[in-house]
């Protein structure tokens, strides 16, 4: 999404991710168009802006597709607008690498994941040297991250508090909490 318009390259990446995780590729257009309408829509019919992947159901995405996408995507908003962020090749799953790099096959992506477990890529050039047939790769890749999701869980007898926080690493190196979500629940106590 850029200036209220769907970016074809980003839509193609989301379509590849949908295909990789085994859901209909048309879901990608539904998500992209729904997000666009939520951002620029001014009518009462405009959808609410989802703040989490689970809320993609607001855009007409079925629960099974949301569950399939949940481990691989995050909606990132700052001041009400989407923030495009590069994919960190040192932390991305094989599925995300397959989607992010046009022409990448799952076996090559899995091989790259295994390589980086031994030695993380220090530069993007180190990464692209491993896949010369696919170079040049998108500028939407990097070897570091600026945004992180941190999850915590505290259990006290039959109560559980789960907290998810979205952090941004500032250029100074300091981390700032952008979002925090707390969920309290009761657990079944086996006895």
Regions flagged by a language model, labelled:
Residues 1-191:
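Compositionally biased linear targeting/interaction segments
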């Amino acid at each position: 999404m850029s200036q209220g318009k769907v970016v074809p390259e980003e839509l193609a990446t989301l379509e590849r991710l949908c295909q990789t995780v085994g859901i209909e590729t048309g879901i990608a257009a539904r998500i992209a168009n729904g997000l666009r309408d939520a951002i620029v829509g001014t009518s009462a019919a405009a959808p609410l802006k989802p703040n989490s992947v689970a809320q993609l159901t607001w855009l007409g995405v079925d629960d099974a597709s949301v569950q399939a996408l949940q481990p691989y995507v995050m909606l990132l908003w700052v001041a009400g607008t989407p923030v495009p962020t590069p994919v960190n090749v040192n932390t991305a799953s094989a599925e995300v690498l397959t989607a992010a790099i046009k022409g990448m096959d799952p076996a090559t992506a899995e091989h790259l994941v295994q390589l980086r477990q031994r030695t993380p890529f220090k530069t993007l050039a180190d990464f692209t040297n491993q896949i010369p047939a696919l170079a040049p790769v998108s500028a939407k890749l990097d070897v570091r991250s600026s945004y992180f999701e941190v999850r915590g869980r505290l259990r006290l007898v039959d109560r559980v508090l789960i907290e998810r926080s979205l952090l941004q690493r500032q250029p100074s190196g300091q981390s700032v909490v952008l979002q925090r979500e707390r969920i309290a629940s009761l657990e079944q106590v086996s006895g």
